[in-house]
Each structure stands twice: as C-alpha cells, then as structure tokens.
Swiss-Prot record:
Subcellular location: Cytoplasm; Mitochondrion
Membrane-spanning segments: none
Annotated protein name in UniProt: Phosphoglycerate kinase
Cellular component terms per the entry's GO annotation: cytosol; mitochondrion
UniProt-listed Pfam families: PGK
Amino acid sequence: MSLTNKLSIKDLDLKNKRVFIRVDFNVPLDGTTITNNQRIVAALPSIKYAIDQGAKAVILASHLGRPNGQRVEKYSLKPVQAELSKLLGKPVTFLDDCVGPKVEEEVSKAKDGEVILLENLRFHPEEEGSHKDADGKKIKADPAKVEEFRKSLTSLADVYVNDAFGTAHRAHSSMVGIELPQRAAGFLVAKELEFFAKALEHPERPFLAILGGAKVSDKIQLIDNLLDKVNALIIGGGMAFTFKKTLENVKIGNSLFDEDGSKIVAGLVEKAKKNNVKLVFPVDYVTADKFSKDAKVGHATDAEGIPDGWQGLDCGPKSIEEFQKVIGESKTILWNGPPGVFEFDNFAKGTKAVLDACVKAVDNGATVIIGGGDTATVAKKYGAEDKLSHVSTGGGASLELLEGKTLPGVAALSEKK
C-alpha cells in the first residue's frame, strides 16, 4: 500500500456537499473542563477548509475515552462544543447521539456551512465492533447492528474525510465502514502520510532510526522492519541493556533485562550485518540506586559495568557524543523512543542532547520525524515541536506503520485517480 497515492481533502469538490469528518477529539478532561485543546486545534484546518469551500454542512464525529459501548456521561463530547465554537468563531450544533432517525433528520436540515458535532461514537458497541462484559470478557457486536450503524453514519453525508490518524490502526466503523464514493485524508492525516512515506518509501540517505523504550520483545517487528530500510540504527533506552549484556557481556547491575528479547538479539545483529546497517549502542551510563527522581546518581562505563543494586537510567557523555555524530551525518532521521528516563531531571540529559542534535540536523537540511508517544512528549516538554520536520499525532498508528503493517483507516481511503 503506497502512502502517497491517497485522495486528499484538496482533491474534493465540497461545494454544497455534506462533509463527514472523522476527527480526533479525544481530549483530556477534568470534569467538563478541557485541560488541553491541542487535538481540537489540530483539526481546525480541515474543518475551516470545508466551510471555506462552500460545504452545505460539516459533520464531525469522534470518540472520547473508553465508554465500552455504553452512554457514560463523563465521556460526552458536549464540552467540546463550546471550545470548538470559540476556536472557529461560529456556532456549533451538538447532537446527543451519532446515529438514528433523529440525528439523520437534524443533519438533513443543515445548510450554509453549519458545523454539527455528533455525540461520542463509542457510546455504541457497533463503533469498535465489541464491548467488554462485567468480567472483562470481549463480547462481539451483532453484525446486523454494526451494518445498520455504518449505514446510518453513511447516510449523513456526501463525502467522507478522515482526519484521525491516532485511530488509523483500528478497523472501527467510523474509520472503515462509511461507504461513500469519495473517502479522503484530511490535512492532518495527509501530512502524516506524506512524512512517513518520505521515510519509509523514498528516504534521502543516510537514513537513521533512533529507538528507545524498555523491552526488545515489544520492538522486534519494528527493529526487523527498519533493518530493511535504514543505514544506521541507534538503540538506546532500557532495551540497550539487553543487547549489551547478550552481545558483550557488559555488567548491567539491576538495569532492565528482557529475557525473551535476549533470545533474538543475535538474529537482529546478524540481519544488520547482512544489510550493512551500522548499529550504535551506548557505551557509558548515568546510574541510579533506585528508580526515582531523587535517586543517588552515579556513572558507569562498559569496561567497569554497572554495580549490583544500581541501574542505568540514561546514557553518559561518551554515548551522547557518538549519537550526536551519527545524527549529524544523517539526512533522514526517524526517532521513536527516548534514550533515558527524561521524566526525571537527573536522567534527562541524554534525551535532551539527542533532541538538540535533531533540531540542529533540521537546521542543516535533514528531515526529522518523531514517531508519536513518549518521543512526542519530549518534543513538547522542551518546546521543540515546531523546530522538527514532523511530530506524529499517532502513537500506536505510527508504530504499526513503522512495523510495516497496513493501517485499516488508511487502506479504506480512496486512491487518487
């Protein structure tokens, strides 16, 4: 599946059309107060574009939280209405359901670019295709009802736009079940696809991936897929210790060791050799006597190893130097996972140094892509989001793309003619 050949909102004629936009308004709430409106702000370009192009109505659908297929008041999208209205500078109509005759009737009356926000899609088990019973067991939704749910959503509009990249790895009804002739990517999704295509389909070389995170076994598919694509791979974070101990018998003290992951280390290194991929590991460490922000801080190198009772929580100055050098030599950089426990100030130096090197690389003409999740949090924490080429909004979705999987929400989009 090519990521670059999908229909985009700009390819559509929206005049006098009812435009259904699947957005991601899964915002953090404190009661009914939105504590971070970033996801709403991110959806504005597609919404405004549809209005400016003369759409008859813009119908917005999203999920919020995990209500498990039932109506749960604290997961209502109602609080988004006022915030969205304020940001758009125009009224927004809120409907207290997302399907059914009442909703269909309200939407059919809309005109003059009216913006309609539907209630949480996940109040219906038919959105996710299942719900959990009291014992946490998965109960599949009735296929006939799923079909009916999808038909009702489809009947609301003339064209479909998907702008919820964070949910693109889920084959949910609002992602794959709206059978309109034209299904296009919104601006957000189009940008995600453009940058991931840049890295995965036609990278400017040298191409470097920086991986962090705790367990090797969680990242097997990711490492395996990237070894077919990159020229160099930095392996940092907790999972570096599994490689170091297995390959070089470095003493790692109480640092993370992934028993299952250790069994596949040799195979991954073999593949890297075969594909001529340079593997870069840390060679020194900032250590702690416990996993805590106020732990005692120590230092260790490969030669002496980490003493028992201590654990490595960040990479040391020599490693930082080596990482910066490799980053500086690269033209395309994909970063997924921090090299240290950046949440604790004493162990954030390595992560900050890698970020600074990435920002510098962008200044020197490289493309740097941050793959969502914790690494996106790093960029936000240090105010670097607009200094990088692209910070992905989808943790799970970007990870699955990088693992070489097809995303259902992307596969469901129409191809450009």
